[in-house]
Amino acid sequence: MRALIQRVSEASVTVEGECLGEIGPGLLILVCAMQGDGEAQASALAARIAKLRIFKDEAGKMNRSVRDTGGAALVVSQFTLAADTSRGNRPGFSAAAPPADGERLYRQFAAEIAACGIPTATGRFGADMKVRLLNDGPVTIWMES
């Protein structure tokens, strides 16, 4: 699985004018299941992100996790993280997991983040979403499992 993690002061996701999820300080996690991914990859990535120390401590160093700070997570599916731009001008997405697998792994990933004690909001898999965020830092990190 692939994830793009952004430290945010706030974030929200809207579908057809309805706000599905919003958080205050925490992480916006854009996530994509890849061909061949399974439950093990979803679990491993969620565990790593839950422990990722990208929030400042009292000394101003990135030494605290979202759990340590009492922050939340907004998890949004984004198959475009599987983009292959190596040829031509139009990206290919054949490396993404099939939609049924992608949705199952997306839901599992979000559930695993929540099981780590992190308040978790989500978007809607496969929907045309509007995502708003206020970056903090900015801090943006790419992870794969």
Curated annotation (Swiss-Prot):
Domain notes: A Gly-cisPro motif from one monomer fits into the active site of the other monomer to allow specific chiral rejection of L-amino acids.
Molecular function terms from GO: D-tyrosyl-tRNA(Tyr) deacylase activity; Gly-tRNA(Ala) deacylase activity; Ser(Gly)-tRNA(Ala) hydrolase activity; tRNA binding
Stored InterPro entries: Daa-tRNA_deacyls_DTD (IPR003732), DTD-like_sf (IPR023509)
UniProt keyword list: Cytoplasm, Hydrolase, RNA-binding, tRNA-binding
Primary location: cytoplasm
Gene Ontology terms: biological process: D-amino acid catabolic process
EC number(s) given by UniProt: 3.1.1.96
Reactions listed under catalytic activity: glycyl-tRNA(Ala) + H2O = tRNA(Ala) + glycine + H(+); a D-aminoacyl-tRNA + H2O = a tRNA + a D-alpha-amino acid + H(+)
Superkingdom: Bacteria
Pfam annotation, one family: Tyr_Deacylase
Entry's family note: Belongs to the DTD family.
Motif (Gly-cisPro motif, important for rejection of L-amino acids): 137-138
Organism: Cereibacter sphaeroides (strain KD131 / KCTC 12085)
Location of the protein in the cell: Cytoplasm
Function: An aminoacyl-tRNA editing enzyme that deacylates mischarged D-aminoacyl-tRNAs. Also deacylates mischarged glycyl-tRNA(Ala), protecting cells against glycine mischarging by AlaRS. Acts via tRNA-based rather than protein-based catalysis; rejects L-amino acids rather than detecting D-amino acids in the active site. By recycling D-aminoacyl-tRNA to D-amino acids and free tRNA molecules, this enzyme counteracts the toxicity associated with the formation of D-aminoacyl-tRNA entities in vivo and helps enforce protein L-homochirality.
Protein name per Swiss-Prot or TrEMBL: D-aminoacyl-tRNA deacylase
Gene (name only): dtd
HAMAP family for the chain: Deacylase_Dtd
Subunit: Homodimer.
GO annotation, cellular component aspect: cytoplasm
Transmembrane regions listed in the UniProt entry: none
